[in-house]
Structure formats: C-alpha cells, structure tokens
Amino acid sequence: MNQRSVICSATARFVPREASTTIPGIFRSHKPRGIQGIEFGNSGPRKYSSDRFICITSVNHHRFRIRLYKSGEEMKAMVIARQSSSPGLALVDVAPAELGDKQVRVAVRAASVNRADLAQLAGTHTSIGGVPQAQVVGLDAAGEIVEVGPGVTDYARGDRVMAMVAGGLAQEIVVDASMLIPIPTNWSYIEGAAAVLGFMTAHNALVTTARMADGESVAIHAATSGVGMQAVQLARYFGAGLIVGTTRSDRGSALLDALGVDEVINTSSTDFAARALDITEGSGIDIVLDHVGGSYLSMNIQAAAVKGRIVGVGRLGGAEGLLDMEALAFKRLELVGVTFRTRTTQEKAEIVHALRRDIAPFRPDAAHRDIHESLRPVIARVLPWNEAEQAYQLMSGNDMLGKIVLEVG
C-alpha cells in the first residue's frame, strides 16, 4: 500500500494514546515535523518515518489500531524531585525509551509501592549501572503490551503482563521480554502490580536459595509485609509442613491466621527462638526467611535446625547483628543474603524463568491462566498515581497490612 494513497483527516494530540478507525491508511498530522509510525502493508507492519503522517499499527476484524507517536514525543512519569529522607516526587514529561531487540513496550495500568522505593527516594538504594539523574521511581509495573520489538516470540500486542522494571511508575515502559510474566486471567492489573516483585523475591529466597523441600518447616519474619505474605502463600503452595509467621501486632496476628499460618508468634511479647524450638520439639526450623535483620540474627541461629538455611531478605531492624560462629558451625547452617540490586539483567531473567517454571499460570504458553486463590495478593489500598507521595507516607507509617498500589492514568 502506498503510504500516501489513503489519507483521511484526523485531529491528534501528540501524547501516547490509541484510537480506532474502520479505514485502513495513513493519518494526516496537524503537526508538520518528526512523525514516526508503522505502515501496514500486505507483508505486515513495518516502520517508516515521515514528516506528515502517522499510521495504523495493527488490524483486527477490520478495525485498525493506530498509535500516535512523534519523534521526541513525551509521556508522563513520576520522578524524584529531590533526594532526601522524605519523598520528593514530581509528575513530569519525559521522553519514551527506544524499543530494542527482544523488548516490548507496555502501557502501564498499575504499579505498586515498595520499601526499596523509600531508600531510592533517600538516595541510598543503588544498583548495577548507578542511579540516573532524573530517576523515574517504581520497581514494578503491570499493563498491556502495545508494541513488540524484533525477536519477541512469546508475547503479542494486547497481552496483559507484569514485570519487575526500574522506573515502573510511568505511562509506558520498555522492558526485556525475558522479564515479563503473564497476568493470570482471574487477576486485575492492580493485583498483577501488587504480586510480581513480591513473588519474585519470595520464590528466589524460598525455592531457589533455600531449596525448600516438601514437608519442611519455614519461619517468616515480618510476615505481614508484602514479601512476607507472599512467602507465606508460596510456602503453603509448595508443601511446607509447618509455617511460622512473626508479627508485632494483634492486627498482624489476625491477618496471618487468615492466611493459614500454622503458628503466629507476636515477637513484641513472645521470644521467637524459644517458641520455635518448643513447637518443633527441640528440632528447630529448617528455613528462616528474615526481613528484619539486626538482633534477629542471633535468634534465627538459636531457632534453626541442624543443616538449616537462614536467608536474609531485608534489614528493617538494622544491618548488623550478633553472629554465634560456634552455633553456626555446630548446626552446619547456611547463612545467605539475597538482593536484586547486584544482579545482572540475565540473572534477574533467570529468577523470572524459575517463577514461570514452577507456577503454571505464569507461563507464556499456559493453556489455562487462572491461578489458585491461595496465591492472590493482599491489597491494602489503591490510589491514583498522582497521589504517590501519600502512598509512600502511608508505607512509612507501617500501619498498612497489604500492598499499596497506584493506578496509572
């Protein structure tokens, strides 16, 4: 098809959006310069550049989807306005990322709030590659694929996906296809955003690092945190024989009871190590997932079984603790920390692959996408993304039980 042979008038605000038409062809722009688009010919979509036109990008039942896209076009993103101990955010226009090989562009519908975001705002959360000057916040996102790059075979436009991604709090993201997880059919975008990072973290800690076997006992500190609750769910899903969850409040105890935790320990009034040894008749806990750190290290070593595994996931209670080297050696314990910050893109993709391998609805080729209700994330609050600062303040207050999710408009 000649790109100028079928022309119809169209008004366009040159911001990321989609429209539909029953007429195939090229749309005349009211902007004179720098339009980029896709020409839809018999051989399929192909890129072209023009100074006057935009074009359809896909066709379905004689309805054509167009993408209004201008060279240098801007989108909205939430960026760090200042780095300090309190959140400083601004919703600004930024240039969208270029789409590369084996990547997809996702129109973001929701992104969750994570504790690592608070460190990011404070300027203390760095990773491989450093921190860009105008940093877009957010570590995850859920949305719809709107563009597919060369070499992507498992996904198509219109697929609903979730991903761990730097800068997720934006109208669009570009992400490697290897980092994508399909959203189960019985989940919303909000649930996808709430789940993806927590499940990646919990699965990597519990299944990959601690090598949990069927029937083993698992203790999860700060079990009412986002990662903690999803670790509880995965421990049950993968056949833990005993699940112990710790919290410091009666509200937290009630929530953990509802999640099916076998033994809830309120550490504000009960000694964790003593109680863990009591309920295991002295044998101890096989796997301890620790989100607290600090003084909990010595309790974990006391509570651990011979050949137990202690996995440090977070340091809410501090980065330093007392280590009993004699007990560590006597029990032949494994003590290991996990983080995403020093992992390469390939290493993160391997974590995604392991999660998709072990939970069938997360596979791109899954015949059935409904996921078991026991794995549904707990959501405490949903806010519009222009209230991101309020969301971070709510998280800082430590009063929310469940994930806080921002809907992206």
Language-model regions: role of each:
Residues 186-188, 211-217, 282-283:
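Short helix-loop-beta connector
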Residues 306-313, 323-375:
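Rossmann-fold dehydrogenase core element
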